[in-house]
Amino acid sequence: MSTARPHLQFPPELLLQAQGVGDGIRAAIFDVDGVLTDGRLFISEHGEAFKAFHVLDGHGLKLLAQGGIVPIGVTGRDSPAVRRRVADLGLSHATYGAGDKLAAAHEWLARLGLAWGEVAVIGDDWPDLPLLVRAGFACAPANAHAEARAVAH
């Protein structure tokens, strides 16, 4: 069994391209399934769903908050696993089971006094598209739906 640590350094050209990209961003709206997880669901014989969350994503959200960017979860699913992960990260802004993610996002923007240009959105699938196209900065994971990747900055 290998004990080698993963290589986490970003290529210098990517860092140079990112300079100034987040200027003016005050909040980050993120989906959960497919963004904080790998998108897979494991279902037990009793119907209980299990998800895998990556610790690096959680660390990134904590760093955003420490940097003054408000992390906001807007997820279409509601599950004990998602609520637990959000609570473990200490995030206080989240909407669970959002049938209309755009309406949920509008509520958060109004509550926090934000405009779309001040918001980054991280989404991976069709329900995230209305948010991604309005965001001041749109992001999508590498394994996101092609349409989500196409609108990402």
Predicted regions and their residues:
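Non-catalytic pre-domain segments flanking phosphatase-related domains
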Residues: 1-30
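Asp-based phosphoryl-transfer active-site loop
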Residues: 22-40, 132
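Short, well-ordered beta-strand core segments
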Residues: 28, 71, 94, 138-140
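Basic, amphipathic juxtamembrane/active-site segments
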Residues: 40-63, 142
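Substrate-recognition element of Asp-dependent hydrolases with the DxDx(T/V) motif
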Residues: 61-85, 95-96, 132
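Short, acidic/turn-prone active-site loops that include or flank metal/cofactor-
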Residues: 97-102, 143-146
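Conserved Lys-Pro-Asp/Glu-containing loop-to-beta segment of HAD-superfamily phosphomonoesterases
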Residues: 102-129
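Acidic, Mg2+-coordinating phosphoryl-transfer loop and its flanking beta/alpha structural elements
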Residues: 120-153
